[in-house]
Amino acid sequence: NVLDLSRLEANMMKFQLQDCNVQEWCSELACLIQMRSEGSIHLELEADAGDATIHTDINRFTQMVSNMLLYPIECKKRRDVKMKLAYNTEAQNISCQIANSPLADPTFSSQKQFILQKTCHLFFEHFNGTFRIEEPNERGSVIYFTYPTK
């Protein structure tokens, strides 16, 4: 994680870019999160990506989004996370909102959490997207990101 952060900061990260159908990727994401969290994260995913395609390093993109959905430290407590993803044809991007994200939860404040947040920010910025964390409120901690479509 620290190495990824250093490479992103220096603009030295190597990417294996390919096209990815966002709706298909979303279908796989839910299973991946279930497996990696061993059932502790219950992901409620609303995806309306239509035929959106992104050009990205799909492994790193998946890693960044997984970091937003999974606990940044060892934790088996059940947690409901809600992710809404939509294709914005006018802006030519996908936009995503993740409510109750463990990565943005102050409970897990640590150097590792900071590094993961910074890495996500730099990754999305590198590909002309956005990444921001909203202060905790009644929905918990919310992360927003956008990523340009092809």
Residue ranges and their predicted role:
Residues Q16-C31, T62:
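A conserved beta-strand-to-alpha-helix junction within the catalytic ATP-binding
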Residues N93-K118:
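Glycine-rich/acidic phosphate-handling loop/turn and adjacent ATP-lid/helix
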Residues Q16-N21, H42-A52, N88, S101:
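Conserved catalytic submotifs in the C-terminal HATPase_c
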Residues A10-F15, T53-T56:
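Conserved micro-motifs of the catalytic ATP-binding
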